Swiss-Prot record:
This is Glycerol-3-phosphate dehydrogenase [NAD(P)+]. GO terms for biological process: carbohydrate metabolic process; glycerol-3-phosphate biosynthetic process; glycerol-3-phosphate catabolic process; glycerophospholipid metabolic process; phospholipid biosynthetic process. It catalyses: sn-glycerol 3-phosphate + NAD(+) = dihydroxyacetone phosphate + NADH + H(+); sn-glycerol 3-phosphate + NADP(+) = dihydroxyacetone phosphate + NADPH + H(+). It holds the Pfam family NAD_Gly3P_dh_C. Sn-glycerol 3-phosphate binds at K114, G145, S147, K200, D253, S263, R264, N265.
Length: 351
């Protein structure tokens, strides 16, 4: 039976997910805050700015700039806006849900954002829970994993994780997305999934910088592996399950983000490695590079949690203190020797 779904955010990922859900037979409204973008998409049946001229919108997909219309009778609300816009969009959604209260079952809230809120250091599900009270929604699900919109647009096989404190909600969302090229697994470790999704963007900036500087595969593999160790340390300290970080939303997302030219964070790092200045890089990208703001949040979080994150600290120095990339690499390599694992205190169970 078709489900009424509102997808909020008509960037590359929001558009592709809305298209996929429409392909799966659901009734989908894709919302953009920009009326001009909506008019262009309706006229051309494309989202050329984000996805090129080859990608065509499903005929049944409804694009709108009217948030109330998009949310009307929606059983699922999927947030696919940049991290820095999550709170403001949720605040626009709240009064509409309040007006709809009592009309039927509350909607499931889903988000596909990969970042942390600057200032509060909150994960995205925490931001949504703070703005949208329990009486207005069924619960919150996060979808995350190794996924570039460009690959999903061409029906490349893709697997993600649907995570929620409520497994039944995760399973409902899982069923909405599943088809012959898109597969979701469920997980109840929301903390681990969101931390992996956010912090891999920081490491991807570093991976891109190494490529821009001409470093080889050995160096990139070292960065990714030790970067995953940092992500795992902070995640477990926050209460995540260690096994999550060897799953799709951990190492899976890290691999795809650190190795692909589709990754905005990788491309930004690559440009920095080639000598471009950060303001110019961000201006030329024309799209949000989540890892830049996440680096600042992660740097502060590491201090507050007393977690060792030397790679994250090095990337912070490059982005926010104008440190030369080769200098921070040298500093990383000159650190004192230490064991790879602390087997005496290691455990597959969180402390």
């Amino acid at each position: 039976m078709p489900t009424k779904i509102a997808v909020l955010g008509a960037g590359s990922w929001g558009t592709v997910l809305a298209n996929l859900l429409t392909e799966n037979g659901h009734e989908v409204d894709l919302w953009s805050h920009n009326p001009d973008q909506v008019a262009l998409m309706k006229r051309t049946h494309q989202n050329e700015h984000y996805l090129g001229a080859e990608f065509t919108l499903q005929p049944a997909l409804h694009v709108t700039a009217d948030l109330g219309q998009a949310l009307d009778q929606a059983a699922v609300i999927l947030f696919v806006v940049p991290t820095n816009a999550i709170r403001s969009v949720a605040e626009q959604v709240k009064p509409i849900l309040q007006a709809h209260k009592g009309r039927g079952e509350q909607p499931i809230i889903v988000h596909a954002a990969k970042g942390l809120e600057r200032g509060s250091e909150l994960r995205i599900s925490q931001v949504l829970a703070e703005v949208l009270p329990k009486e207005l929604i069924q619960g919150i699900v996060v979808i995350s994993g190794p996924s570039h919109a460009e690959d999903v647009a061409t029906h490349d096989i893709t697997t993600l994780t649907a995570a929620s404190d409520d497994l039944k909600l995760a399973e409902k969302v899982q069923k909405l997305f599943m088809n012959d090229y898109f597969r979701l697994y469920t997980n109840t470790d929301v903390i681990g999934v969101e931390i992996g999704a956010a912090l891999k963007n920081v490491i991807a900036i570093g991976a891109g910088a190494l490529h821009g500087l001409g470093y080889g595969d050995n160096t990139k593999a070292a960065l990714m592996t030790r970067g995953l160790a940092e992500i795992s340390r902070v995640g477990v300290k926050l209460g995540a399950e260690p096994l999550t970080f060897i799953g799709l939303s951990g190492v899976g997302d890290l691999i795809v983000t650190c190795t692909s030219v589709h990754s905005r964070n990788w491309r930004a790092g690559n440009a920095l490695g080639k000598g471009e200045k950060l303001p110019d890089v961000l201006k030329n990208m024309g799209m949000v590079v989540e890892g830049v703001s996440t680096t600042k949040v992660a740097h502060q979080m590491a201090r507050e949690l007393d977690v060792d994150m030397p790679i994250t600290d090095a990337i912070y120095q490059v982005l926010y203190e104008n440190a030369p990339i080769r200098t921070v690499i040298t500093d990383l390599m000159k650190r004192s020797g230490k064991p790879e694992f602390d087997f005496d205190n290691a455990s597959l169970q969180k402390p």
